[in-house]
Amino acid sequence: KSAAEVQNTQQAIIPAQEKANLGNQNIMA
């Protein structure tokens, strides 16, 4: 993969991880 492809994949994954983390925080709170 090119660096741009890897970066695009990471940008797509990170928001999903952040949403999951926010959901976990809401459950814990």
From Swiss-Prot:
Question: What does the subunit comment say?
Answer: Homodimer.
- Source superkingdom: Bacteria
Instruction: Name the lineage.
Output: Bacteria, Bacillati, Actinomycetota, Actinomycetes, Micrococcales
Q: Does the keyword Nucleotide-binding apply?
A: no
Ordered alphabetically, the record's keywords are: Cytoplasm, Hydrolase
Q: What is this protein called?
A: NADP phosphatase 1
The UniProt entry's GO CC annotations, sorted and at most eight, read: cytoplasm
Does the entry feature the keyword Hydrolase, yes or no?
A: yes
